[in-house]
Amino acid sequence: MEFAGIITEYDPFHNGHAAQIAAAKSAGAGCVAVCMSSGAVQRGGVPVLPESVRVCAALDAGADLVITLPAPYACATAEQFASAGVRLLAALGCDTLVFGAEDPDAAQQIGRAHV
């Protein structure tokens, strides 16, 4: 893993998000890019915190780059949200996607299914 990507909203950014960025770095990512929704979130509303605050939080936590997921994709279905994020990160040369899950067992099952 040289270039890790995270597709997210960070609405709001919390310690779990910081741990995710740190885990990507400790796993060998030389660069971590975050593709983040801007002025709209997937639930169709506006974020709790402005984009500038969420970008600063990601950078302060160790992300090297934050790019914006355009609002039409941020407000779309989960599949379209993720697909647009994957395409943007792939265009930058991202070779690994990093994700989290509220249920650790689900994350392990997903990881095993895609090995």
Over which residues does each language-model region extend?
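Nucleotidyltransferase catalytic core that binds NTPs
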Residues: 1-114
